[in-house]
Amino acid sequence: MERNIWHHNIRKYVILIKAGLIALLIVAGLWCAEYQNRWQSRMDNAQELMQDLRKQDAEALFPKLWQDARCFPVRSSDSTQQNGGTQWENGGSRQSGGTQQENSGLRQRGGSQQNGSLSKSWGFDDGYGEGRSYGGSRRHEGIDIMAVDAGAGELEVQSVSDGTVEQMGWLELGGYRVGIRSPGGLYFYYAHLDSYAAGLQKGDTVKAGTLLGYMGDTGYGQEGTRGKFPVHLHFGVYYDKNGEEKTIDPYRLLRCLETKL
């Protein structure tokens, strides 16, 4: 009798162990598939980014972008992680700024940022080159990352790259903005901020992931103008070509950086 019970228990444990191993293999398979999909997505976007640069006769920019740009410009909910040995700031105080989106609505790509118990999100699509009318007919020189379920001053904006704060302050079109010059010579432009990170000054050296300020709706008027458009971050990338400032479409770059969230 005891022998039968012992054999029964052994069979039960064997079944449990097999079930556990099968579950572990399934989880590992799903994780590998997700990792492969994210990596493949990043590679696909990198290839499309390079094709876009070829169209602009700017192939030399690709290695600079790939090396310099390391963070998505809007922080994710787990942005307290370590990045290259540098602790990303989270929350903290801010300094008041006293930075376009004319097509609002749901965006194709997006993410979220945890603010207390509420999840604040954003989204973006490829609006580079679209027409703009404020201040005269012109084309859009960047990508608008739109706030979804978040107000001005709620979403944190961080530096995409290491670099130096080259420009800071008010622009009629860009509102409160920050311009960062990267080690590779690229100029990353962040506009329509609600306010700046406390202590940030022109000439400061920053790291990828350094808090720059907070997403807002400033611009399109005299200093302090707000509310002329939905809350968003205008993100632009500029480079020098024979002494002339040029822009690139940063959509594919953002897609690549988005996979790092």
PLM ranges: what are they?
Residues 3-25:
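N-terminal Sec-pathway targeting helices
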Residues 137-150, 179-186, 237-250:
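Small beta-barrel nucleic-acid-binding modules, principally OB-folds
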Residues 23-35:
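Hydrophobic alpha-helical membrane-insertion segments, chiefly the h-region
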Residues 159-199, 226, 231:
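Zn2+-dependent peptidoglycan hydrolase active-site motif and core
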Residues 81, 94, 113, 202, ...:
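Acidic, glycine-rich catalytic/binding loops that coordinate metals and/or anionic ligands
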Residues 146, 181, 191-194, 207, ...:
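Residue-level detector of conserved, well-ordered beta-strand and adjacent loop positions
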Residues 177-180, 207-223:
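Short hydrophobic beta/alpha edge segments that flank linear recognition/processing sites
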Residues 34-98, 102-176, 208, 221, ...:
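Surface-exposed, glycine-biased beta-strand/turn segments
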